[in-house]
Amino acid sequence: MEKKCPCYVEGKNTEKRMDMSKALFITGTGTDIGKTYVTGLIVKKLAEEGKSAAYYKAAMSGNDRRADGSLIPGDALFVQKISGITQPLEEMCPYVYEHAYSPHLASRIEGHPVEMAVVRDGYRAVCDKYDYVTVE
């Protein structure tokens, strides 16, 4: 039985369907407990087995700036390095914040609120491009 993509919105996208087993959601009960590390290892293992694997995180906070002032998505960069994947950082996370608060608070402070449509569209694009997507 086919299942609709978890980001499917009736009337908002085509009838494209996705096997739900292609996405793996990594969660934890706190910060600094190893979610990103474990996610990186999962992506690495998938890639080593010849799978087209990707990483997606809707928002991340506590990021450093490059010399040009742009923000570096730290968790995405870490996963990219530990796993060896070449997925562009820009498609890994649509919302990157500097302040080291929860993303919802950092988004308010920085005046760049998270829009669910942007998160869904980014996730959908990654799902369309890769065989396996890990979501943190």
Where are these regions (language model features)?
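Extreme N-terminal starter segment of soluble prokaryotic enzymes
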Residues: 19-25
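N-terminal phosphate/diphosphate-binding loop that engages ATP/GTP or pyrophosphate donors
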Residues: 37-111
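Phosphate-binding/switch loop-helix module in NTP-utilizing enzymes
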Residues: 102-135
